[in-house]
Amino acid sequence: MIKSFRHKGLERFFRKNDSRGIQVQHASRVGRILSLLDEASSPEQLNIPGLFLHPLKGERKGEWAMTVSGNWRVTFCFDGEDVIAVNLEDYH
């Protein structure tokens, strides 16, 4: 279950289905990713073809990312079975 967000527009999209805080062309894929994150209790449950789940490295060790489009990723962490610190970013 998603417990916290870093990106206010992403949180608004998740809670109110208001896409003003994200790019319109990303809405469908981001919506799918958020639904999966809300149902997941471990990274293994998110290893879905086409979403390219991968752990981050270096200073971001412990964080995970899923591909939205181009360089855009939804990043997040697990805290036990909960998903926290959900963000939408271009970290490349």
Language-model regions: role of each:
Residues 41-64:
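A short, surface-exposed loop/turn module that caps and links secondary-structure elements
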Residues 57, 65-92:
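Enriched for short, Lys/Arg-rich terminal
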Residues 1-33:
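Arg/Lys-rich, positively charged N-terminal/basic patches that mediate binding to nucleic acids
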Residues 37:
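Conserved phosphate-interacting/catalytic interface
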Residues 1, 18, 42, 49-52, ...:
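Glycine-rich, flexible loop/turn motifs
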